Amino acid sequence: MTGGDPAVRSVDTRARAVNATGPDSADAFWTGPWADTLAIHGDRAAADAERLDLPPLTIDVDGTAWTLLRGGHGIEVRAGVHAALTVGLDTAAFVDLVCERRTALGLVIGARATGDPAANEAFCAWDPVLRSVIDGRGVYRPGDVPLVGADGGPLDLGQRFRLGEGEADAAHFLAEAGFILLEQVFSAAELDAIDAEFAVAVNAASVDDGESWWAATRDGDRYPCRLLNFERKSATLRELFTDPRFLAIGEILPDGHRPGDPFGEHFSGVTAEGLTKRVGSVEGLACLPWHKDCDRGGHSMYCSGLTIGICLTPVDPAHGGLDVMAGSHRANIARAQTDRGLDLPAVGLRADRGDVTVHLSCALHRSTHPATDERRVVYTGFTLPPRAGDAVANGSRTNLERERAAIGDPTRRGRLASELEPRPGRA
């Protein structure tokens, strides 16, 4: 595929510079930019907060407290502590929140927010409404996202594609649905080579290596369920990064995607992660519940990237599946809405070895546990081209790698148990 149809919907949602600066203090923000945007977007945001039934929440920034609450005339923010739930941030974390460099979830699991689990839950629940006020991205309402085919009729969500065939239809489908399945992209020999390198990396991993997440089965088998920086351990994968077939995936859409890091830290170079999901896993993050790859932050600076899954085993009920919420990349969706159920269709992808799954970084997706056979997949991706003045602004790669590795730390998950703990049959 060489360049998408220019008439296809763009997935470039960037509205903020990577090096965006924020307020000098919490007082300056709440009395200035917040008040200004509340005057513009306040009615919609108040309705969003009401639908989500958000509790009062105090945000303390370096000792200066302000409280968010639903008042009689919309969302109110009051100086001082006026809530039973309080989260604490330093000024740098608060600036990252306002700029969306990090979301509330990203700050909580990154150990940059202090609060008990209930306060952290409330903090994360308020986050979509903060975006509704600050950026005008209203929280999703039923019917907001129609799924329309290229012919104007309902979009057929069961479509499968091959590179070089039906290019316009593939581009339309990916932009509309937020995912696509590409059949028979890589050969058995290539997959065998990656599988062998993956096995070596699994055997070499250790709990404290800073490059792996660990899980355990009900039989007590502890294993590395996710190998970070797998591209460093797989020469075959590094060769594929320059292969025309791989590069063609980034050309499906007209937005200029190029190999990069779609996972949340936004490194300047291409990265990969090797995942294995063993039967009977009961501890750890072998599988993740519904989430977006931008859930931890950066949506308005980086989205939408493309997350690429190279299937080393089939994706099916036996090996474990991949579900995607069609159209979810086009909406600001609160976690509570996902838990209650959306009117958007959840599509269970079924793939063979050598197929490639693609989903946008803003698309809600989840993996499901294997029933009888281990699942193995390598995830890598594409990012949008940098804009003038853009640069990696999240700190050194070493620090970012440390932050990513810490997600697998079970003590971090305890900060927000309901958000991150695997759930039977759907994590």
Which residues does each PLM region occupy?
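Feature captures hydrophobic
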Residues: T2-E165
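Histidine-centered metal-chelating micro-motifs
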Residues: F94-V95, D295-R296, C362-R366
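Non-heme Fe(II)/2-oxoglutarate
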Residues: N332, V358, A363-A427
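Non-heme Fe(II)-dependent double-stranded beta-helix
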Residues: G152-E176, E183-L288, P410-R412
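Hydrophobic beta-strand signal
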Residues: T114-G115, L181, V358, Y379
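Catalytic core of non-heme Fe(II) oxygenases with the double-stranded beta-helix
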Residues: A248-E251, D255-R258, G280-R350, G389-G395
